[in-house]
Amino acid sequence: MIGCHGMPVDALFINSGILGQRTFAEFVRGAFKDTVDGVRVTQTLVTDDLTPAERAMRFALCLPLWPSGAAGPRNLDFHRYRCELNAGLLARNRLRRLERAGRTFGVLHFHRQPTAYASLDVMRRIPSIVSIDSTQRCVLQHSRSRLETRSYGPNVRRDGAIFRAARLIVSTSDWAARAVRQDYPDCATDTIVMANPVPLPPASGAWIAERHERARQGATPRLLFVGGDFPRKGGFDLLDVWARARFHERAALDIMTNWPIDAGVLPPGVTLHRGITTHTEAWHALWRAADIFVLPTRDEAFGIVYQEAGAAGLPAIGTRMNAVPEIVRDDETGILVMPGNQAELARAIETLRASPDLRRDMGTRGRTFIEASADPERYRRDLAAAIRRVAGR
């Protein structure tokens, strides 16, 4: 539908195609499958349909040349910059192919900023939106030395050039928007905050009441952990706390991950679930069966999975870092702990485990918050309006 907007704006969405970014690509595919709100969308994922030459380039650029062990400085081989440049070069290749085929676009949408690393000249001739969840602050805050900090300099400078060239920055959080202003005070690009769109699970309206009824009948509370990078997401902190506090005597823990964990060494009461695809029946079943969501992450910019917990009506245990407190509201929709603080994590688990009423109340508030802040229909309308504005419509 074009409506009163005249000719639609042709927008090209360039997606990095990794991890949670594919979830956003699925949203775009569904929300903009037809011309809607004056916008006609073409989307490309830079990791799809790689040519042999692109595979060779990815191997060369993303090959680690410096050990990334638990101790000592990291990234002295500029690995992060090389990987982000790879995403940018792949994106530029796809744009070039489309333009050679005669396609023209009124707006480019880069999701996230590394996909624009090789397209600064293009951004100067085609109005562009850059979608971010963080600046390089998310890695700088974990730097172990001055030398490591300096190794991220190329990323910091490239991000800055991209932010300045963009017509609009769309940030998932207030935290990331503030980081742009603080890290690049000379950047005059408008920035708006739009939390990631998250759909409510199908037929999930009664899940909270179901859980409370299970608890009334004496069912064992179930905790759910969902995370790909198990160590970075605090998975081993959770397992340590689980074993030391003997939570298996009064709760159960489901772990949804593809990280190579040896199931044979897991503590009692823990069930490992592998190979489950997002938004499938099996995925929804685990969210429905859970009573508490727990992700004591040590490294997170935003955390879409916390939004998914709220959408499922679950109280969440998260960490006090970056944008997480914008989603998990301490003592309202969940409990926040300091990253790596196992004593706080144990207390948070026990607090929620022991109180079905608290779980119900926090889960209800969490679902209400996600309905209001992450509604996919509203996100589509707001994003379409932003695209039209950038295009001058």
Give, region by region, the residue ranges found by the protein language model.
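Conserved acidic donor-binding segment of nucleotide-sugar-dependent glycosyltransferases
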Residues: 330-331, 335-342, 351-357
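Nucleotide-activated donor-binding/catalytic signature segment of Leloir-type glycosyltransferases, i.e.
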Residues: 257-285
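Membrane-proximal helix-turn-helix segments that form the acceptor-binding/catalytic region
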Residues: 149-169
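Aromatic "clamp/platform" in nucleotide-sugar-dependent glycosyltransferases that forms part
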Residues: 298
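Short hydrophobic beta-strand element within catalytic cores of glycosyltransferases
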Residues: 315-318, 328
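Carbohydrate-associated surface elements
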Residues: 175, 197
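Conserved donor-binding/catalytic core segment of Leloir-type glycosyltransferases
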Residues: 205-233, 239-244, 253-254
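A short, well-ordered alpha-helix in the C-terminal region of glycosyltransferases
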Residues: 351, 358-373, 379-382
